[in-house]
């Protein structure tokens, strides 16, 4: 029996190679990308070349043919250096590509998956101004007209909105039917009536774009319905469950990165004639953080392996997301504390991680909603 955090050889090689790439190619650009709130374009090309943007796409479509667990390892390794990069790769794989693999027709898969393995970024458009946690209260509408669909509405908080060329958009074709009218559509950036609006100026994960999407009688071919008409709620629920594991991976990567910086700093920073890492109080705080991270990693890895084994993982996904998000915030806060004044300035890396950590308790299902999910599943 293999322990949860003991990786197979191919898993270890993937994690190490992705982290090596992140350390060499991403780390020198982190501060600049954060300040300008924009990814370096050349870096996106390198991520495609590395293979992480289509890691789960079958080899027959030009992808890596790897497992969901492999994508989780990649997100963790990238987020250890920059959680903004981690979430871009996460949305691409755990939300968009997974939805295409599960619900896309053969024609849809052939049309989009080879591009998503090479140069096409995806986004997932569910949230609206009045439907955040209450996702199925969405007001974007779709109506049949002249042999196609016409979408009208507005989406908010859409990750990858600035870079994406393909969007999974949820709209209601029959509002009287409630959530049973919700349908998932594949919208290309160039479709008539579609535009990307305001880009949000965020507290953290600033390089990752978060945008408004506008649909003004947007024309969508009938072939671009993902799954069945009226079954979009199922697409949304099931992909978000997987996405929560991806956010858990992002958060443990962030926490590990913060701890890495903290250990290195406390070995070098001297007060009262010795390194502050020699003081027992500091050592105990670091030991507790390391314990938290390992516990969070166990939860994330367990949820991911359950998903790959086709076993129920809804409760475990909620558990791993809420706990990993809390651990990330605690660890980043500890890093700022132990860096002292240096932790409060942009010259040092931990203030950014502190800002980045907060989003983990908000997106892809707030912590309160995760608690509700866990309670419902264990209490009935």
Task: Tell where the protein language model's regions lie, with residue ranges.
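Alpha-helical interface subdomain recognition
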Residues: 1-91, 103-108, 118-119, 132-135, ...
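Short Ser/Thr-interspersed hydrophobic loop/turn segments at strand-loop and sheet-helix junctions
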Residues: 51, 75-79, 171, 187-192, ...
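Helix-loop "lid/cap" segments that line or gate small-molecule binding pockets
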Residues: 95-102
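A short, Trp-centered hydrophobic/proline-enriched beta-strand micro-motif
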Residues: 118-127
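Short Gly/Pro-enriched turn/cap motifs at secondary-structure boundaries
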Residues: 130-133, 157-160, 173-176, 202-209
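Flexible, small-/acidic-enriched active-site or ligand-binding loops
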Residues: 137-139, 190-221
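A short core secondary-structure module
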Residues: 148, 152-196
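A short, charged helix-loop
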Residues: 211-238
